[in-house]
From Swiss-Prot:
Disulfide bonds: none annotated. Induction: Transcribed under both aerobic (with succinate or glucose) and anaerobic (with glycerol with or without fumarate) conditions. Part of the sdhE-ygfX operon. Pathway: Antibiotic biosynthesis; prodigiosin biosynthesis. GO terms for cellular component: cytoplasm. NCBIfam families: PRK10878.1 (NF008130). GO terms for biological process: antibiotic biosynthetic process; respiratory chain complex II assembly; succinate metabolic process. Monomer. Makes weak or transient interactions with SdhA. Interacts with YgfX. Interacts with FrdA. An FAD assembly protein, which accelerates covalent attachment of the cofactor into other proteins. Plays an essential role in the assembly of succinate dehydrogenase (SDH, respiratory complex II), an enzyme complex that is a component of both the tricarboxylic acid cycle and the electron transport chain, and which couples the oxidation of succinate to fumarate with the reduction of ubiquinone (coenzyme Q) to ubiquinol. Required for flavinylation (covalent attachment of FAD) of the flavoprotein subunit SdhA of SDH. It comes from Serratia sp. (strain ATCC 39006). Changing G16R: Binds decreased amounts of FAD. Does not restore aerobic growth of deletion on succinate, less growth in LB, does not restore SDH activity. This is FAD assembly factor SdhE. It comes from the Bacteria.
Amino acid sequence: MDIDNKPRIHWACRRGMRELDISIMPFFEHDYDTLSDDDKRNFIRLLQCDDPDLFNWLMNHGEPTDQGLKHMVSLIQTRNKNRGPVAM
């Protein structure tokens, strides 16, 4: 997936679990454009992971072994925490 194809990335952010939507969508909407190209690629790679893995990582029930994905999970958690609750 191309890092500049925002409609496709937006679609990929839509998950089958509301908990993931609440974590991933606000990050995409508020922070994606500020990411470096490397972080955008890592975000896209993260979106290609299975929902159960994403859920566990974002809820601190484990972490990815891949350092780029680990960094992205941490970045999503930090930015979402700093932003505060987001209504969906």
